Amino acid sequence: MKKEKDDNLIAQNKKARHDYFIKETVEAGIALTGTEIKSVRARRINLRDGYVQIYGGSAYLENVHISEYKQGNRYNHDPLRSRRLLLHKKEIARLAKAQSERGIAIIPLKVYLKHGFAKVLIGVGQGKKEYDKRQTIKERDQKREIRRKYGI
């Protein structure tokens, strides 16, 4: 099974799939300033501690670090500012309902470019316990051994 090469992938939050059971995913646009999109295209973004917060009828991407643009001047952006996500009202309502449940988090999974626009794939996830993480690692190792043994 060959993996597809994704040239437009900017950043991926690998820790998210390790820490959460992802129930559903939604693609959203991000409202960025000029220096932010230049930094994103230069792959200077970190999703590790990011999450999505919904308030005031809008969804915001919080705690995602987009480094300042190197050639930027005094009008450079704040690296940790809240960034508005571009979603339909029905999608925001569905995410708000999910967020109100206990133990549910909305987290960014990956950032990529699509037709020249920056998009973020956000996932609705339920936190894993420590034994769930160990079980996932055990299953992954077993699958790897089977593939190695039978050459699949």
From Swiss-Prot:
Location comes to: Cytoplasm
PROSITE patterns tied to this protein:
SSRP
Which Gene3D superfamilies does the entry link to?
Answer: 2.40.280.10
Where is it found, in Gene Ontology cellular component terms? cytosol
Q: Which SUPFAM superfamilies match?
A: Small protein B (SmpB) (SSF74982)
Q: Does the keyword ATP-binding apply?
A: no
Q: Please name the GO terms that the record assigns under molecular function.
A: RNA binding
Q: Which PANTHER family is this protein grouped with?
A: SSRA-BINDING PROTEIN (PTHR30308:SF2), TMRNA-BINDING COMPONENT OF TRANS-TRANSLATION TAGGING COMPLEX (PTHR30308)
Similarity comment text for this entry = Belongs to the SmpB family.
Q: What does this protein do?
A: Required for rescue of stalled ribosomes mediated by trans-translation. Binds to transfer-messenger RNA (tmRNA), required for stable association of tmRNA with ribosomes. tmRNA and SmpB together mimic tRNA shape, replacing the anticodon stem-loop with SmpB. tmRNA is encoded by the ssrA gene; the 2 termini fold to resemble tRNA(Ala) and it encodes a 'tag peptide', a short internal open reading frame. During trans-translation Ala-aminoacylated tmRNA acts like a tRNA, entering the A-site of stalled ribosomes, displacing the stalled mRNA.
The name of this protein is: SsrA-binding protein
